[in-house]
Swiss-Prot record:
Pfam families: Lectin_C. It comes from Homo sapiens (Human). Its main location: membrane. This is Early activation antigen CD69. Residues 1-40 are cytoplasmic. The gene is CD69. It is found in: Cell membrane.
């Protein structure tokens, strides 16, 4: 084949009117088009696999967030059927807690709790105590323990205190913070903590 014929054959796709086959039907170009769909299909499969792995990872992370909670979770216990803590109340150990953001005297705080069907916090267990100390932080919060002259300590729900923890100080009303449980004059204005059982 002469150099002229090669030139014409190579450029035939540029001049289909010259009677030569264009590149769409030329066997010379057919190998270039045979694999053209294989690359996009492979990319699509890889994208689907990547997206699937990404979705699985996101689901695993979101499930892990709920299955690996911190030390204190504020969810209903497994034997409860209905969540019943009001807005701004925190659920823990079958009780709803309200931690105030304003200060009042012990009696005024007890009245505020009563308006919500609660009492100043009654602490029944070491778990409750640790939870409340951690929640209270460095601020002093009234709890529902009070001592009238000549009488034993009593909780705001009327139950007698069994002295399972130590109360420092010699005043009549009890507060707690993260490092201590102590007594103070009842007229002092402090934050307070209410609690009531789940409904």
């Amino acid at each position: 084949m002469s150099s002229e014929n090669c030139f014409v054959a190579e450029n035939s796709s540029l001049h289909p009117e010259s009677g030569q086959e264009n590149d769409a039907t030329s066997p010379h170009f057919s190998t270039r088009h045979e694999g053209s769909f294989q690359v996009p299909v492979l990319c699509a499969v890889m994208n689907v696999v990547f997206i699937t792995i990404l979705i699985i990872a996101l689901i695993a992370l979101s499930v892990g967030q709920y299955n690996c909670p911190g030390q204190y979770t504020f969810s209903m216990p497994s034997d409860s059927h209905v969540s019943s803590c009001s807005e701004d109340w925190v659920g823990y150990q079958r009780k709803c807690y309200f931690i105030s953001t304003v200060k009042r005297s012990w009696t005024s705080a007890q009245n505020a709790c009563s308006e919500h069907g609660a009492t100043l916090a009654v602490i029944d267990s070491e778990k409750d105590m640790n939870f409340l100390k951690r929640y209270a932080g460095r601020e002093e919060h009234w709890v529902g323990l009070k001592k009238e002259p000549g009488h034993p300590w009593k909780w705001s729900n009327g139950k007698e205190f069994n002295n399972w923890f130590n109360v420092t100080g010699s005043d009549k009303c009890v507060f707690l913070k993260n490092t201590e449980v102590s007594s103070m004059e009842c007229e002092k204005n402090l934050y307070w903590i209410c609690n009531k059982p789940y409904k």
